[in-house]
Amino acid sequence: KPFPERFTKIAEWVANKPGYSFKHLEVNKLEAYAKDFAEIYNDAWQDFENFVPLQTKGILETFNKMKTVMDEKLIWFAYINNEPASVIVILPDANQMIKSFNGKLGLIEKLKFLYYRWKGVNRMRAVVMGTKKAFQKHGLESALFIKLKEYVLPLNQYVELELSWVGDFNDKMLSIHEATGATFGKRHATMRKLF
């Protein structure tokens, strides 16, 4: 379904502001994007309980492992005056690629994987999103969604985006989900046992 009109107007206004630029990840520049991701993530998430800073090396390793399922034009970065400001990482739903494998990975499954990788996936999953504190409430997240939409709609492939897990303590992300017109899908409960 289309984004609400107000959301779209704000996002387009932000996307065209002077000094603001938006780039999708480029596989041949993974190290630079891993560095930008670390800078954004560590700033955006530092005040959350049990936060552990991410290192560029670890992010680069993760990006390299994600290459088999990654569509580089689903991972977007926002920059303000060339400073990394915001990021959204979205992947094609790997479950759709491997669900028929029944735990096997032979030649037939590898061929199926290649087919599903390019033609058979119609769902995306947002893995992580973050904006540096200094740039929160600038509408960058909205603009990232618009940039994503500009790529995804002409493909006529993806029909659903799951915005993944967002803690009920994260009011900012919950408000972004609401602004996009997202519908609630699942509620997960996390429990811990205290000894």
Give, region by region, the residue ranges found by the protein language model:
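Conserved beta-strand-loop-alpha-helix junction that forms the acyl-donor binding cleft
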Residues: 131-136, 162-173
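A conserved beta-strand-loop-helix scaffold within acyl/acetyltransferase catalytic domains
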Residues: 24-131
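Conserved GNAT acetyl-CoA-binding A-motif
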Residues: 123-124, 152-167
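Conserved acetyl-CoA-binding loop-helix of GNAT-fold acetyltransferases
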Residues: 123-131, 136-152, 179
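Flexible glycine/acidic-rich beta-alpha junction loops that bind and position SAM and/or redox cofactors
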Residues: 1, 93-98, 135, 170-171
